[in-house]
A protein has these predicted regions:
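Conserved small/polar residues in nucleotide/adenosyl-binding loops
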Residues: 253-254
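Short beta-strand scaffold segments in enzyme catalytic cores
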Residues: 84-86, 98-101, 133, 219-221, ...
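CN hydrolase (nitrilase-like) catalytic-core segments centered on the catalytic cysteine
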Residues: 66-83, 150-238
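Active-site catalytic loop in hydrolytic enzyme cores
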Residues: 90-166, 179-187
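Short hydrophobic-aromatic micro-motifs
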Residues: 42-43, 141-146, 172-173, 201
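Short beta->alpha transition motifs characteristic of CBS
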Residues: 50, 100, 111-117, 220, ...
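Cys-nucleophile CN-hydrolase/nitrilase-fold catalytic domain and related Cys-dependent amidase chemistry
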Residues: 22-23, 30-104, 109, 178-192, ...
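N-terminal active-site segment of His-dependent metallophosphoesterases
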Residues: 1-41, 172
Length: 254
């Protein structure tokens, strides 16, 4: 455990995302986000500003600068790091589903979604991410992941170096995970925590999306033994919080 590692306060805010309406979604976040200084990290769902509007992916990707500007202001005003994904133009001519990690001073790290959901045709419009990204925040090493990446344990494997140091302490997952597969969502979050001996935060949307697909949320914060620390109410907007304990984590790694 690093000497500068203190408990980390995590908030996962599940939202009923307005379809292709960034202004409405920005207003929702403003109305429901934690008070300034009350947490260390705030997570928002995948494609938080537009919903998972894949048929209009290239169109909504052009709106990305406004979403990033909003996240930057939110982090600065809240005094916490903010994580969310946004559709952005990719150099290949396709679109990237990009996890933005933005700190209060404006420092920004990004990670593109690696695993595309071919059944829904994501591979036709989206470019795959190539890098496993870990950020360090207030002494914690945090791995960034987007939705379907959760299903791939090899991609998220937490390895130890020669000194027994793990790649990361916590896994952050932002998603638009359908209600029909809620059991897979909750099971996989716990599985990733247990197999990687790390904390896990999973944030999901609620409500019915533009395809008519319902989402129940089931956002949750998981301990390194797969134990449930906090769970959001199903089908309701709002955030759930928990504190991650570095001492507890260090004892598990012994």
């Amino acid at each position: 455990m690093p000497s500068n590692q203190s408990p980390l306060r995590i908030a996962a805010l599940q939202l009923d995302l307005a379809w292709c309406d960034p202004a409405a979604n920005f207003a929702k976040v403003r109305a429901l986000c934690p008070a300034p200084g009350s947490v260390d990290v705030l997570l928002l769902p995948e494609a938080f500003s537009t919903g998972f509007a894949t048929p209009r992916a290239r169109e909504v990707a052009a709106w990305a600068p406004k979403a990033v500007e909003f996240l930057t202001k939110l982090a600065a005003e809240g005094g916490y790091a903010v994580g969310a994904s946004v559709f952005v133009p990719h150099e290949s001519g396709k679109v990237a589903n990009r996890f933005y990690w933005i700190e209060p001073d404006g420092g920004t790290t990004t990670a593109d979604k690696r695993h595309l959901f071919a059944v829904a045709g994501e591979h036709e419009d989206f470019a795959r991410g190539t890098e496993a990204v870990v950020v360090t925040w207030r002494g914690w090493r945090l791995r960034l992941a987007v939705c379907f990446d959760l299903r791939f344990p090899a991609w998220l494997r937490n390895r130890l170096d020669a000194n027994g140091q793990a790649d990361y302490d916590g896994l952050l997952v932002v998603a638009n995970w359908p209600e029909a597969r809620e059991n897979a969502w909750t099971t996989l979050l716990a599985a990733r925590a247990m197999e990687n001996q790390c904390y896990v935060a999973g944030v999901n949307r609620v409500g019915i999306d533009g395809f008519g697909v319902p989402h129940s949320g089931a956002s949750r914060l998981i301990g390194p033994w797969g134990d449930l620390l906090a769970a959001a109410d199903l089908n309701l907007e709002g955030y759930v919080t928990a504190e991650w304990d570095p001492i507890h984590l260090s004892l598990i790694h012994i």
